[in-house]
Amino acid sequence: MHDPHGHAHTVRPPGRGRNWPGPWRKTPGRLLGTSFVRLYQLTLSGFVGNSCRHLPTCSEYAHEAIARHGLWAGGWMGFFRVLRCGPFGTHGIDLVPEVLADRYVWFMPWRYWRIGRKRAETRA
């Protein structure tokens, strides 16, 4: 599909929301985490306004991270992403990694801080 200026646009399938539409295992932890993020999106997000400096937004990032990597890893990734989204933090496109490297183990959650930060530093 093209707009009047000739730019191509992808069309989202009908019925899809703003969150990641890919397939993911519906485990209890993932359902709980993504439901919490969705509840935030439907209630508090409207009061906060468009204040996110990243693309996808922090709540979309957290939803996708929890859906892809589970409540523990995805929750930490979303938490650290929100911390990076301040006035002196990172900005720009910061996608959720499809696969986590072996160094991101469950018993060292502070390592998840590095995921979006390193990519943002290399682009600057």
From Swiss-Prot:
Biased composition (Low complexity): 12-24
GO cellular component terms attached to this protein's record: plasma membrane
Keyword Membrane: yes
Role this protein plays: Could be involved in insertion of integral membrane proteins into the membrane.
Family recorded in the similarity comment: Belongs to the UPF0161 family.
Record's subcellular location: Cell inner membrane
Region feature Disordered, mapped onto this chain: 1-24
Superkingdom field: Bacteria
HAMAP family with a match to the protein in the record: UPF0161_YidD
SMART domains the record matches: Haemolytic (SM01234)
Keywords for this protein: Cell inner membrane, Cell membrane, Membrane
Bilayer topology term: Peripheral membrane protein
Predominant location: membrane
Protein known as: Putative membrane protein insertion efficiency factor
Record has Membrane as a keyword: yes
